[in-house]
Amino acid sequence: MKKFVLIASLLALVSASSFAQKTVDQTIDYTGFRNIEIKKAFEVEICPSETYSVQLSVDERIAENVIAAVNNNTLILDVDEKSYSKELKKELKAKNSIPPVLRVKVFCPILNKIVAGDKAVISASENIKADDLSIEFSNSVLARNLVIDAKAVKIKLLNKANARFDIYANEVEYSAENSSSATMVVNTNTMIVSASGSSVNTIDGEYNSVEVHARNSSATTFSGNGNKISVEGSGSSSVNADALSMREASVKLSNSSVCKINAKDNLKGELLGSSHLIYNSAPKIEIERIVNSTMTRSSDTKYNKNK
């Protein structure tokens, strides 16, 4: 693996403020990469470019421990914390210690995969363009207003990751687990959503078809317009698609799950456990089974449960 290490003696920039951290700046050029893996709490800005490079600005105390490496077509951003001196470890763990600066601009023309964890902050200067793009954010990653233009997009959020997306793609597959959350605007032909844990998801857009799998105590809200939607809900999950205007809907619920649906033409339902289906408009209704569950029109004032 070709490894680039920042040396503290390079280009140290000192702020006029005595409280500011001294930083080391460096630009590194690469022949190419298609993936990015961010392993520590870097603040990363993705910048579309015809060439491949990174611009780094990092705390001089840890500059020699910062790694920017390309391995197997993947740009890896990491910090070798095990090699910190005892004095530095003590300093960084001290009360009111300021986290080290770890700012990176990544320049590349196209990406296939972005993986980030450990409280990294991700943004982009312009639209991220790709053919097939895979994204996995975990461990309190914060993604700010990522605009994606691709043929197919696959997104997975875990462990308190929080993200804001604008997506233009033919296919979108989105998975949210644990206590992750996302807000997104989507323009797509097909969207598949898998929500579990206590994840919270807000999705607005234009779709042809939407497929939803909701489990545990997840909460997913849809708005926009489309052709057809299918929902499978279990646990105490909630799917609120009341503001999503669709022609057709198929809903299967179990346990204490709740679904609000807005189907203009046709609605098919199977309700088990103590589940509840609330529907809008006046569709043709086909019931496969209802066992210890309820189905009501949204205008029914007797039902005031908000999930």
Map each language-model feature to its residues.
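Residue-level detector of intrinsically disordered/flexible regions characterized by low predicted structural confidence
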Residues: 4-5, 114-115, 203, 242
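Short, surface-exposed interaction patches in beta-rich subdomains
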Residues: 165-167, 182-307
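Intrinsically disordered and other compositionally biased segments
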Residues: 6-7, 11, 143, 182, ...
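Bacterial Sec-dependent N-terminal signal peptides
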Residues: 1-25
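Flexible, active-site-adjacent loop/turn segments at secondary-structure boundaries
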Residues: 17, 42, 244
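N-terminal hydrophobic or amphipathic segments with adjacent small-residue motifs
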Residues: 3-6, 14, 34, 191, ...
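Acidic (Asp/Glu) and glycine-rich low-complexity loops/linkers
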Residues: 20-39, 43-158, 162-175, 183-185, ...
